[in-house]
Amino acid sequence: MKVRVRLAPSPTGTLHIGTARTAVFNWLFARHQGGEFLVRIEDTDKERSKPEFTTNILEGLKWLGLNWDEQPIIQSQHVDDHRAAIQKLLDLDLAYRCYASETELEAMRETQKAQGQAPRYDNRHRNLNPEQEAAFQSEGRSAVVRFRIDDVAAISWKDLVRGPMHWRGSDLGGDMVISRRAPAKEIGDPLYNLVVVVDDAAMSISHVIRGEDHIANTAKQLLIYEALGLPIPQFAHTPLILNSEGRKLSKRDGVTSISDFQAMGYTAEAMANYMTLLGWSVPEGTDERFTLQQAATVFSFDRVNKAGAKFDWDKLNWLNSQVLHDLPKDQLLHELKPLWSEAGWALPEENWCLDLAELLGPSLTLLKDGVDQARPFFEEPTLQADGLEQLAMEGAKAGLSNLLDQLDSTSWDGFDVKQAQQLLTNAAQAANVKKGVIMKSLRAALLGRLQGPDLITTWGLLARIGQDLNRLRRCL
């Protein structure tokens, strides 16, 4: 059997990290098995589904490197198939029309609640005779379609993550609504549990991989598979992503959208790497830093955890920093250039920009850090408190003055590191201070602060665009 898996997001919002992690696990399993990864856009919620969310989801998957193998399926384009399946269930007497009004159903739930019972449909219209149906129709009542669920039904499957799973029909809340309310004798909009079964069968999906919050849906859907005589896929229910307090990660916890992570300066490689680790343990002796392609060679469900996976910002930041540190300077510049241009900076020649990217790379955690750290190379910096304090030290300005005098009288063809070090030594001796005082003071003059990348390389870059002398003079 060929492995075919699918991601089935609803375009009612941007690509959530939970959905993206599900996509990663689906993609890894498909690639490990030599199978196919498909995408189905579940847009049957007409009020909340928006084209811009579909675009965001697909672009997010592309950004993460999760390429799909067939054109994405749009669920709403197959509604006739869904209604045909409902009609088949009606014809087989495995489903029926329920005319109970919302007011009646709410009263039923309130009564159950008052009696200390869990709310569930009481199957009141399960066995209406033709005369009763005609009476409801003559009142102008609309109806939903419900799928019959026997309380004694035994539902079992072997979950690829959780092992044997066992449910009973009585656990599922009564007969299940499979289409929205519509005028009598019509079939309203088909609902999730029916639609998913029909679509997965039509797409020949072999494995359904999704979050553990779908376990109850799986129990319901297995009954529909059997009723329609459709082949049943294997199921894997992955752990939820949790916040620091152990609750399901939600929008209340802040950033959860992949596009937000992208805007914050996280790389696609680090995000995909981290999401793989959210609920999956690497084989012993395997580095926790890897590409998707590397992970696909060893991915298996026996290493997917049952317990929820806590989101760890420190781990994500570390992974992102490692990716940025190791990027070749041309690739790093490719990422940084748009950010520098967006900041309004006129960029010098390419080689200078490449050298700046190489200088900043080891100190970056996020791509956006490359804007803050590059700022003093494009704009004259404001002296910070630590810089002012350094320049006020005894001998600091005298040493910088001597350094400036040497530079004014020195002729060199390009910036020479050895000669620069000698100039600093000379300045320290002239001011009768340690060389470190002069180096810190020079950093304060060039960058406005004492923290920053390698001093000599920084000096060389600013010298190449004629800014070193200007900044020294400003501080004297």
Curated annotation (Swiss-Prot):
The keyword Glycosyltransferase does not apply. It is found in: Cytoplasm. PROSITE patterns: AA_TRNA_LIGASE_I. It comes from the Bacteria. A motif ('KMSKS' region) lies at residues 248-252. SUPFAM superfamilies: An anticodon-binding domain of class I aminoacyl-tRNA synthetases (SSF48163), Nucleotidylyl transferase (SSF52374). Keywords: Aminoacyl-tRNA synthetase, ATP-binding, Cytoplasm, Ligase, Nucleotide-binding, Protein biosynthesis. GO terms for biological process: glutamyl-tRNA aminoacylation. ATP binds at residue 251. Its EC number is 6.1.1.17. InterPro entries: aa-tRNA-synth_I_cd-bd, aa-tRNA-synth_I_codon-bd_sub2, aa-tRNA-synth_I_CS, aa_tRNA-synth_I_cd-bd_sf, Glu-tRNA-ligase_bac/mito, Glu-tRNA-synth_I_codon-bd_sub1, Glu/Gln-tRNA-synth, Glu/Gln-tRNA-synth_Ib_cat-dom. One of its GO terms (cellular component) is cytosol. A motif ('HIGH' region) lies at residues 9-19. Pfam families: Anticodon_2 (PF19269), tRNA-synt_1c (PF00749). GO terms for molecular function: ATP binding; glutamate-tRNA ligase activity; tRNA binding; zinc ion binding. It catalyses: tRNA(Glu) + L-glutamate + ATP = L-glutamyl-tRNA(Glu) + AMP + diphosphate. PANTHER family: GLUTAMATE--TRNA LIGASE (PTHR43311), GLUTAMATE--TRNA LIGASE, MITOCHONDRIAL-RELATED (PTHR43311:SF2). Belongs to the class-I aminoacyl-tRNA synthetase family. Glutamate--tRNA ligase type 1 subfamily. Catalyzes the attachment of glutamate to tRNA(Glu) in a two-step reaction: glutamate is first activated by ATP to form Glu-AMP and then transferred to the acceptor end of tRNA(Glu). Monomer. This is Glutamate--tRNA ligase. It comes from Prochlorococcus marinus (strain MIT 9303). The gene is gltX.
